[in-house]
Regions:
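Non-catalytic C-terminal accessory region of glycerolipid acyltransferases
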Residues: 2-3, 92-197
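Short amphipathic alpha-helix with an adjacent loop that forms part of the alpha/beta core around
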Residues: 27-29, 98-99
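Glycine-rich, highly charged phosphate/nucleotide-binding loops
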Residues: 22, 89-93
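Secondary-structure boundary/capping positions in well-ordered alpha/beta enzyme cores
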Residues: 21, 56-57, 82, 104, ...
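Aromatic-capped interface at the extracytoplasmic side
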Residues: 17-24
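Catalytic core of membrane glycerolipid acyltransferases/transacylases, capturing the structured
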Residues: 3-9, 13-17, 29-88
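A residue-level signal for beta-strand positions that form part of recognition/binding surfaces
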Residues: 20, 34, 57, 137, ...
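Residues at the C-termini of beta-strands that transition into short coil/loop
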Residues: 27, 64, 85, 144, ...
Length: 197
């Protein structure tokens, strides 16, 4: 077992019972090929929760400052985390994400770009659409996290059916249009869960 899967099993063993994680829709994940997982963002725990519930190893961007700490500099790459310089158009991070997708790997992102602690869904940033369009044959798997995170209170994680980006590519749609389509899929997952209460 490599370090990534070891860490995943340890974190899963802690977070699953603590937040009574209720996960559905993992069968929608393609077993191979590039996948961009796009989720709403309600708390700092979202990246590890998506990481431990996704059925395939998932790569995330994290602010470059985290890599300045010696321990994290060595640890984060083993957790499939790569640096991004926030507030800049970081070409290295962009190239890394696109390369991972074209290589048939999974990249996770939170299109809102910031946490929405009230649980409402914000506007998605065009980066999600950009990566979806530029990532070769990448498909998008929408994800909804329904909280809040409170110990021993159920947190729901829902993965939706893959969104095929081919029609958008064929008609040369822009990144913003693709992002809006992605956000709509996330919104539908959230609304479906809330209406089921």
């Amino acid at each position: 077992m490599d370090f990534y899967h070891f860490a995943k099993s340890v974190v899963y063993g802690v977070l699953k019972p603590l937040y009574r994680l209720d996960v559905k829709g993992t069968e929608h994940f393609p077993k191979e090929g590039g996948v961009l997982v796009c989720s709403n963002h309600i708390a700092d725990l979202d990246p590890p929760v998506v990481g431990i519930t996704a059925p395939r190893p998932i790569n995330f961007m994290a602010k470059a400052e985290l890599f300045e700490a010696p321990i994290l500099k060595n640890l984060l790459p083993n957790l499939h985390v790569f640096p991004v310089k926030r507030g800049l158009s970081d070409r290295n991070a962009i190239r890394t994400a696109i390369s991972l997708l074209k290589d048939g790997q999974v990249v996770g992102m939170f299109p809102e770009g910031t946490r929405r602690k009230d649980g409402t869904l914000g506007k998605g940033m065009s980066g999600a659409g950009f990566f979806a369009l530029k990532g070769g044959d990448t498909v998008v798997v929408p994800c909804a996290i329904i909280g809040p995170y409170r110990p021993l209170r159920k947190v729901k994680v829902r993965y939706g059916r893959p969104l095929d980006i081919t029609p958008f590519r064929e008609r040369k749609a822009g990144a913003e249009e693709v992002t809006e389509a992605i956000m709509q899929e996330i919104r539908l997952l959230i609304e479906k869960e809330k209406s089921a209460k």
